[in-house]
């Protein structure tokens, strides 16, 4: 059984961590307490768009994936109604690279017009593939408003 440790840093960041000495890999999950529920009903998709923009580079790291891959890591992210989760895995000896990448984009995301246009297209294509081009793919979008009527 793993001992789960919880801390709140001086900047308010909540840290939950546990150690597994049976592996040489480290997993980092950065979870933002924001998702589709925070969007205006007439302006949806921003949580997912920002998820993608987080991979567009930061002020000090123009390409997020290159240094991560050089450190032997991999990453992905997902968004739902309640949270946006970014995760990466790296070999234990390169955990500082993972923290460096996450902290740099947390503090200095490169929010350029070019990146916005590229990622907007990617998000729209994902929506088409997952929802519009699938039988009953739009059911969740149609039923969701009915599930939360007050």
Per-segment meaning from a language model:
Residues 53, 57-58, 98, 105, ...:
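Scaffold signal of the M16-like zinc-metallopeptidase fold and its non-catalytic homologs
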Residues 42, 46, 64, 95-98, ...:
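Stable alpha-helical elements in mature extracytoplasmic
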Residues 27-91, 133:
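M16/MPP (pitrilysin/insulinase) zinc-metallopeptidase core fold and M16-derived inactive scaffolds
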Residues 1-7, 86, 144-150:
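Histidine-acidic residue clusters that define the catalytic metal-binding segment
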Residues 57, 89-122:
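M16/insulysin-pitrilysin zinc metalloprotease superfamily fold
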């Amino acid at each position: 059984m793993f001992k789960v440790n919880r801390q709140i840093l001086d900047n308010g960041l909540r840290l939950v961590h546990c150690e597994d000495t049976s592996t040489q890999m480290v997993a980092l999950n950065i979870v933002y307490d924001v998702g589709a529920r925070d969007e205006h009903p007439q302006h949806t998709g921003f949580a997912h768009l920002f998820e993608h923009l987080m991979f567009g580079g930061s002020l000090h790291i123009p390409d997020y994936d290159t240094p991560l891959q050089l450190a032997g890591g991999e990453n992905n992210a997902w968004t739902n109604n309640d949270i946006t989760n970014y995760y990466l895995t790296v070999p234990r000896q390169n955990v500082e690279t993972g923290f460096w990448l996450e902290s740099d984009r947390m503090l200095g995301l490169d929010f350029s017009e070019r990146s916005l246009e590229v990622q907007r297209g990617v998000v729209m294509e994902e929506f088409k593939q997952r929802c519009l081009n699938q039988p009953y793919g739009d059911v969740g979008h149609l039923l969701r408003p009915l599930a939360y009527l007050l």
